[in-house]
Every structure is written in C-alpha cells, then in structure tokens.
Amino acid sequence: MAYDVTGLWLESDLTADEEAFVSFYTSRTGTLTLVPGGTGGYYLLWITFRRPPTSREERERRDVEIQTVLAVLSPLLGYPHVIRRSPPRGSERVVSFGYGPNINHRPTTLSTELGVLLRELGLQEWARVEVGRHLVSKITQTLLEPHPPQFIRAFTQNTDLVPYEGLEVPEGPQPVARPHIEDDVIMQAVMISLGADLLPLAVQASTGDNYNVARYFVIPGRCTMERWPWNCARQAFGIHGAYTHVHSSVQRGIRGLGNLLFHSTLFPGGQTQGALTGLYATEPALGPRAHSRFRRIFAKGVQQAEMLQGAGVPTLGGFLKTVRTIATTPGNALAVCSISTTTSKECISLRRMIPQQTVVCLGRFEPTDGPDTYPNLYRDSSDNAVRILETLKLVQRLAKGPIFSGLNRSHDPAPVVRHLQALAPRTGLELFVSKLPDEVRAHLPADPAAGPDAVEAAVAEHFLNVYCSLVFAVVAESGAVPGDLGETPLEVLQRAARLCACQITVLGRTSEQPGIRIVDDLTGETTRVFSVDQPSSTPPSPWLALSDGVRVSGHPEDVDWGLFATGSTIHQLLRHATVGSKEFFTRHMDRCSNGLIAQQAGVGPLDIPVSDYHLVLHSSMLAERVAPRVPDTVEAITPSMANLLHKDFETWVKALPQELLPVPAWRGQAMAMGEQAYKMATNVSTGATYAITEALTNLMFSPVSKLQDVVLTGAVAWSPEDHQAGLLQECLFACKEFCRELGVALSISSAASSPTLSERHVRITQQQETVEVLPFNSVVFTSWAEVKGSRYRVTPDVKVEGNALVYLAVNQSCLIAGSTFEHNFLASRHPIPPLNPSTVASLFMLVKYLMSKRLIVSGHDIGDGGLLPSAIEMALAGCRGLQLSLPAHPNPLELMVSETPGALVEVPQVHLSEVLRAARDYRCVAHPLGTVGPEGQGNNVTILQNETVVFQETLTSLQVSWTSFSDEMWNLVTPPLHPLEDMHRKDLGRLEHHLGSLRAMCLGSQLRLFSCPTSPRRVAALVLPGSSAPYALMAALQNTGFEVATVTVEELKRGQSLSGFSGLITCLRTGCQASYASARGWVLALCNDPTCASTLTEFLNRPDTFSICCGEVGFQLLVALGVVGRSESSPYTYGPTPPQRWAVNLETNVSKLYDSHWLNIQIPQNTKSVFLRVLRGTVLPSWAQGEYLGVRYEQDALEYILRQRGEITLTYHGNAADETLPARHYPRNPTGNSTVAGLTSSDGRHAALIIDPSLMFHPWQWQHVPPDLTPLSMSPWAMAFQSIYLWSVKKINDHH
C-alpha cells in the first residue's frame, strides 16, 4: 500500500523538558553551548494518508480537511499562529532536531483515538496522525553532526521517543517487534491453581465467612445503588439492591485499565465509584539520573490518574513510597490501584454454557507487546474501555435478563490467549481466521500456498501472544430474551454495542472439544490450523517449589542520636517524597467528578491532602425523594403553582426539624490503603502485619462501626528471583493468621512481579563497578467497609484552640526499625518487633468508642515519618499551631520519628480525663502531649521536653519543607512562571463566602420536594461514545423533580427526537487522552450530521427548553451551535457554525495539567441565566476540575461585550467575599487570564459552564465548610436546580 505523508510544523512554546534542557546548556562551557534566547519550539504534526492525491481537486480537498482538523486539534497544539509546511532548516551553527513517536511502530494511543474521531468526521483517507516535537537551537560551536548526542540523550534515551531524520513513509501494516511473552511467574504462582486438586495460593491465604471463589476469594458487600435510565431502554430511575466489592491490582504498565475490565467481568453491568492508587518508585536523589527518575514518577502517577478520570472514576487518594538506590540506577516505578465497583444483584447471573454458542469480543484491537515506558505513548485507551463498560451496562437493561453464558478475563498481566482460556475453562473454543481483527489478517501470509505453519505463526504472533484490552464473552443460545423487540441474545448485545459505539466482533463458537482451535476458513476448504491447550492440562508453576528465601535479619547497631540535629532531621523527613508527596498528585487528579465522594484526601481550610481514609456514597439522591417516610413529602404542583413559587425563592424551602442533622442518609464505602515496604525489606512476614495494621489505623477514623465489618484486599508485588518463593508463601499465610486473630476478612486479589527499583554496589574498582539488584517485595492492603453516611467521623485537621492532643499507641516502645528515618538516615537495619493483634484490635476499638461518645474532634494515625511529622500534618491541615511536651526519654528525636502504630487525637479539655480512662480500660497507651494553638500560618509548632524547647518552627516554614517534593515536581513538569505569578502559586484555601439572603435558609432549612405528575419534566443527558454519563448532574436534577435519561449519539443519528424533553445536559469530557480536542471533534461531527444538528437546534430554539452544559463537551457544544459567546446582540436562531468561526474556546490552565481545586466563584449581579438567577451576587465555593478551566476569546473586546449584556454567569473569585476582588492569579484563577467560568445565552435559558455546580449540591460534597456556615443544612447551589425545575414546570403551557 502506497502511503502519503504530510508534515506540519506549528510554532509553540517550549515544553517543560525542553525548558530544562535549554536552561542547562545555555551559556554553558563544553561541547554544546546554546545561545541565550536562541531556541524555538514547534509541534510536528505527522499526517499519513492512505494514498497520494491523484488530482488537483483532491489536493485542494485535503487542504480544506487539514485546516478543519487543525481547528479541532488547536488546543492540543497550543492554538498555533504560525504553521510551516517544511521543517525549519539547520546550519553549521543551528541545530534542527525533531523527535517523537516511532512512525514505523504501531500508532500511539493518542493517534488511535484521533483516528476513530477522524473517521467519525468522514475523513476516511486519513490513516494516521501523530504529534511530535521539533527544536531549533542556535549554538556557539560549529555543528559536526546533524543531531548532537546531547539532544538525543535528553529527549529520546531510555524512552519510547526517537529522533527524526525526515518525513518517513511507512510501508504496509505497522509491525510490532514482539518477543516471546512469558507468563508472569508471580501471577501464576499466586493466582493460578497449583494443581488439579489444589486451590490457588491466593485462595488458600484468604480468610472470611461470606465469600465466593470466583477467580479468587471474592468477599462482596451488600448495598444499594442508583440505576439510571437509558432513553432506549424505557426504564425509570430506581434504587436497587446491589453488591459492592473492592479489587486491588498491581499495575506493571501493561494495559493500565485491565483492572477495570477484569472487575467488569466479575461484576458485569457495575459502576466503578472510586479508586485509590499507590506508587513505588526509585528515589529521585541527586545525581545524573535524578531528572529521569522524577519524570518517571510523574508519568506513572499522572498516567494512572488520567486513565481513571477518562473512565469517569475519581481517584480519592493513595501513597508514594520511594526506594533508595545507587546513583547510576536508571529508575523505575510500580503502581497499585484499588477500585470499588457496585453492581445490581440481578446483573451477576450467567446462563449455562453449552457447545455451539457464539464467542464475541468487545472493544478495539489495539495490541501492545509489553510494559509501556516513558512517556507512556501506548497506554490503555480510556475511550475504548468506557465503550466496553457502557455496553455491558446497557445490555443488562435492554435484555432484562442474563444473556451471557461466559464472561471472563484472566488475571493480569496476561496475553490474549490466557483470556480466551479463562473464558471457557471447561469447554472448548473454535475461532475462525476470517473473523479475526483486520490488523491480524493483514499479517497473514499473502501467498495462498503458504502452509498451516505460517498461518499459525502469524496468528500466534499478532493475536494470541499480545496484550490487548478486550472483553471476550460467550453469548447464550438463540431464542428471544425478555425485551421490547423479541431479539436473540446476540442481537441484543449487538444493539447495545451499536448504541455505545463499541466495536463488537463475532470470533467463533464454543465446542465440545477442550482447548482453543483456530480454524483457517479463508481457503476453499475449512482446515484446522492448530490448537491451544487449556490451563488445566498445563503443569502448575514450578516457582513455588524452589528453595526458601534468604531472610534479611536486622543487624542492630546503637544509633548515635547526638549525630542528628533535630530541626534539620525533621525538615528532611518532611521533604522526603514518602512523607510530603501527596499534594502534587492530589491537586492534579479527578477527586469527585461522579458526585458521590464525601471524603477525598484534602481536608481543612487549606485543602491539605492528609486524610488517610476516603468515603464514597452509593447514591447522591435525597432519600426523601426516593423513599419518603411521610406521605405527601413530595408535593404535586401545577404550572400555575410553579409560576407563583418561582417568584418567591423563600417558598422553595421548609424549616429543618431541630432533631435532624444535615447528614447523608445513604450508606457508602470507607476505604484506605496500608503498606510497609521498608519493614518488609527486613522481614516480609512481620512487615506485612504492619501493613495490615496501617490499613486498619488509616480507616479507623471513618464511619466504620466495628473491626469485624472491615475487609482487606491484598495486592502482591514480589521479586521473581528464585530464592524469594519460600518467603512469599510464608508472608501470605502469616497475613492470614494475623487477620484471623483480628477478626477481619482478607482476600488476595492480584499478584505480579516487581521491577527493579533498587540496586547496591557489590564491588567497585577503578575499571568497573559490580552491582546487584535488591529484591523488592510488598503486599499492599486496601481496607474497606460498608458504612452509614450519617455516622460520626473525624478528619486530621485540628479544630479548636486549647484542645488537648493525645497520643494513643499499641505499646510503649519506640519503633525505628523499617521507618522512614531508618531507610534514609541509617546504614543498618534493625529487627522488626512482632505485633500483637489483640493490641491492634484494642486500639481500633478504643478509637471507635471515643468517636461513638463524640469525645474526639480530629484524629490522625501515626504514618510515614513518625509521631512529629504526623502531628505537623494535623497542624498544617487545621492551620493552627501546636505546643507539645514529650515524656521523659533520653533521645527526644527517637520519640519524634518513632513509627509505633498508633494515633493522635484532638480532645476537648472537658473530655480529657474520660479519654484517658477509656484508654486504660482498653489497655492502650495514652499520653497527653499538649494543646492546639491559635489559627494562623505564622504560629509555631513547639516541642518541649522537661520545659526545654527541643524543636520550634512556624507553620509556614514547615509547609515549605512538606511541599518541597511537590514543588520539585511542579518545576520539573510545568512551564516556568513569571516570579510575580510564582508568588501566588500556593495561594489556596481560607475561603470566605457570601450567601446573601440565602444564608439563613441554608443554615436551617431544606428543599421542598416538588413533582408535576400531570406533565413530568424530562431531561436528556447526551453522552458521547467513550464518555461517562454526568451522574452528578443527573442526580441533582432528579433530586429537584426532573426525570433524567441517557441519550446516545447513535439515537440522535437515527432520528431520535428531543420533543419529549424540556432540558438538556451533556457529558463533561470524553474518555480520550486529548479530551478537549476530542470533544471539539465530536461537537463538529454532531454539527456536520444533518439529523443530529437539526434535532439539537430545534430543541434549543424551543422557548420552553433549557440546557446546563458543563465541562469541555457541554461548553463547546453550545459554542458550536451558536448559543453562547456571540458578539451580535440582535435576536438570532441557533445553528451550527464551523470551527474557524467559534468566537470563544477553552483555555488551558497555567499548569498545563489537569487541576482539581476548591475555589471561590462569584455569580454576577446582572447575569441573565435562568438557572443561576437566584444566586446573583453571591460568592460560593466550587470544585474546579479539568485541564481547560478558562475562556479564550477569538474576538477583541468580546468579554467586555458579554459582561455588559449579562451573558456571563460565573467568574473566579478571590478568597475574600468582597465582590470587588476577582481572582487574578493561578490557582484561584486557573488560567491566570479571563476570570470567566461560565456563559449564558442571550435569553438566559442555556448555560455553558466550565465548572459543574452539581458537585456542590449537598453540603457533604463540600471540601470544607467554614465555622460560620456550620451546620450547613442545605447547599446554596441546590437552589439553582430548584429554580430551573420550577421555571420548567411553569413553561409547560408554552410548549405547543
């Protein structure tokens, strides 16, 4: 096939890596010296067409297509103004250097997703689009070679990027060099059966009463869940009985969303409601590898969060632990991810599998051959995963009964062949070559005379032995299933896939003969090519039969505490990545987008991310709306009544009975993580029991009522070295016994080999250095429990001046062994003392007793860094000083850095004696340490011993140290800021709010609940393929009386009318890596489709309709349809406009990253917005989440025009409530430019908002409620949704 390649060079700013490179080599003596100010950057856009143009008309058409695509992709390319058709030329003193993805490799994930979008736009001749970079640098030396080695090392060494020599034309199908894929030895040893009559090690090492052995020891919880209607399924909203479960997995960089797909086959049709992530990484100490290690930590941590947010799953918290190594180690990273999924009870049933049933696969075939490396170009596509997950949800609604007889995936990491084997373990599969994906068939032998061996090799190399994010399923036998159309199970599945735009392929059928048979049916005769045995006929993993491991025993040496200065030691601990790393990652990941998150990591007035437990509720619906306890709680109204009510907002609420507290009524799930890799490096079994203890102490301040309610899910990362086998078995069974004695359930859900994270010198000579790899072993435990959302809980931020701070612990000893202090300051390892499970249980029960009596108001477990760093985190979170007095001890620093399991609790002085008495009753150690000081960052944390000050620092100084790792990460991955802007970079929190006349209502009232039975108001939630539904918006609208249903793009294309709807909302973002560019492409596709465009414009032009379009998708849709952001003021009708005429677009954040901040928002006094009119003049807090959180104007003075006309609905505001103080700087103004965060149409009916107001509908969704608004019984944002409902009902008579 003859391809045609076009390159475009688009002038842009330098990336953060390029800035660092230029800064390093500018005016530097040596073999490469860059001229100051002499380096420019370009994006290089590679466009590959399937064939060269054959006529002038075709070339002109391609030019038009290129301009359209550039307009769509312009945010991804930095809104370029200068575009070149040829590369910038180099000379003897000018380096012209291009680099990027390997064009001769398979397309990157970004390219694959863009390819799907381009086909949606009708650009069938476009084969591939890739984005690279190009630098032009003036140098002082004479250039001896085109690409100096310094450029190659800086931008392509140890990465998936390559230097470019020119516009290379790919030839034929893009090959992937695929080595023979070996099964992961740890996964096989732990998760796979050891023999015909033996259970897998993971099952043997698990314990619990209520369980089911389904691929592992599954311990589900019972709960309820929201079931949202799809327009195509004609079902009503409801709360249904459900199961919930937490699955934890080790992420080696192979198909990073395999855990979501695995869980979706275990609990089909479910909704993943939240995730926790952890990261182990090589410590980025000083040295030649420091920069690359930092980059790998950033890439791995952010990549995991980005994939989850693309799938609509908030990341609630997690950990980062770095491992010390020698300076020459390249560095590596290993991620752990735990996800919580809830599924309706009727969705988990399967039908009986018999021969001749259809085998299908869901999803795009996008194979990789091994772990992804920096910069993660071939990571999993969230867009593809969401299409699969949404199809599995929808098919359950369409069929109204089970249609699958097999739905299974192997434990990851595993190639396709393992997933097929897991699909039908007791029967056989017969797959046909003609049904294999196109890419596989493209690699089949072209010669018809090629024998079966050649076909077998091609199928094995390009299909069976690759990693791919597909879901394989066996569809039940023919016969109509319950439903509207009398379809067969396969037809129902195909319809669901079509509606969700999910690729579905019929591969073959089940058979009586065991094993997998690949049948070549492309020749005249049907010929069996080869078969693959089932796992049961293969020998079990021999790894566990290997010799016992080498146990690392501690070599205790007396610590000379006099060598360590207290102040500098504490500051070094705070600067360590393990202690102070959470801030950067927390501020740059989705924390709450589904509206179910009652506790994420950030707490206190400064949103300091120190909460170790996290809380996700199973519903954000008002209980009185769904299941009213009193008749007539939901009041029926008519349009005339709505008209009267709409005029007086004081009639929208009713007084809240004093005995009722403003707390969520639904149950939820509390989650926390625990790990102790440092301690396991000395003793794996004892260290793992400390990890279990940490998982429990992290969870104990949540609403969990008793220890027996807790379930632990374990993920094993283990060295595959032969001598580690015995240690693994010993460790897992020690964990089982420890959990049995505690009375908590344990399930091992995944296992994988650990990469090389650390090395040490064995021998160093002048000629060479000999190093050995240090084995890395860890078990990460995720603790979780079903809890009542109304139950009392506490957070780590100290609250009240004068309260006592009490130290609770399991014993009196100081624990330095395996601590962060030991890992970073001491050369020897101390032996790890064993833990007594009864004392751990006593500590847990003591804290629960104190909480049940409301004797404590804040609490924090003793975590990484020890006692004093934990106390400092509480002080930082509460923005209050501390004055503490240590008990008598010869080495006060030893007390401060001790990691003995325990907790710090804040106790009102009137309850102190009762708390100490309770501690004695529970046989726990309790020491009153001191008191909480006044509020203010200028106050001190002071530590005394025998009335002598041994440590004293201001909160400001401590926060500088605690955030130093985050600052280093920021400086590494973000563009440099002007010094005046950099001054404001940490200016967050301490928000003052102005509720105006709504204040009294919000402090003592609740919404009246209305409905209009005679003419229900319906809202369409338009969801793009590969995007998650806007569940928070849907719940907020349903709460105020609307009936909300999901509408797919496919329905619009097929002529689905919106005449039965009065409101429109959209998904907020797409699942693609370049979400905003993808959103623009989809919006253009909707505008280009005559049926979709006509349906949408007809709806928007109706005078009785409204829309609340939030986020990247919603904002751009209203812009593209000419609804908002227009300069003309005369009345006009809405309709599609080309992207070159879009007057406003979204602007990227200053950080160039996804941001998640709790900010002040002002609603202008003159806004025309029908939705937000009731909030005029107020200053309210809001979640601002996204990568593009500002408005960019393409016409001069347009913002002034819109502001004067009252078409601006929201603006970013400073921390003060004064309406004259808008936010000018990042992060209070995420883009640092226009303060606008929302627009409205000229008649006020349609709102295009950057933020999502539904994320603040309930008080429990707020990051922080200030004391002057406590207790907040109703969020003012809820009044906006009440307003739009009453407006919609009163407009009923306007719809003819």
UniProtKB/Swiss-Prot annotation:
Keywords: Virion, Virion tegument. The keyword Isomerase does not apply. Pfam families: AIRS_C (PF02769), FGAR-AT_PurM_N-like (PF22689), GATase_5 (PF13507), Tegument_dsDNA (PF12818). Gene3D superfamilies: 3.40.50.880, PurM-like C-terminal domain, PurM-like, N-terminal domain. GO terms for biological process: intracellular transport of virus; purine nucleotide biosynthetic process. It is found in: Virion tegument. The keyword Acyltransferase does not apply. One of its GO terms (molecular function) is phosphoribosylformylglycinamidine synthase activity. GO terms for cellular component: host cell; viral tegument. SUPFAM superfamilies: Class I glutamine amidotransferase-like, PurM C-terminal domain-like, PurM N-terminal domain-like. InterPro entries: Class_I_gatase-like (IPR029062), FGAR-AT_PurM_N-like (IPR055181), Herpes_virus_tegument (IPR010077), PurM-like_C_dom (IPR010918), PurM-like_C_sf (IPR036676), PurM-like_N_sf (IPR036921), Tegument_herpes_virus_N (IPR024346). NCBIfam families: tegu_FGAM_synt. This is Protein ORF75. It comes from Human herpesvirus 8 type P (isolate GK18) (HHV-8).
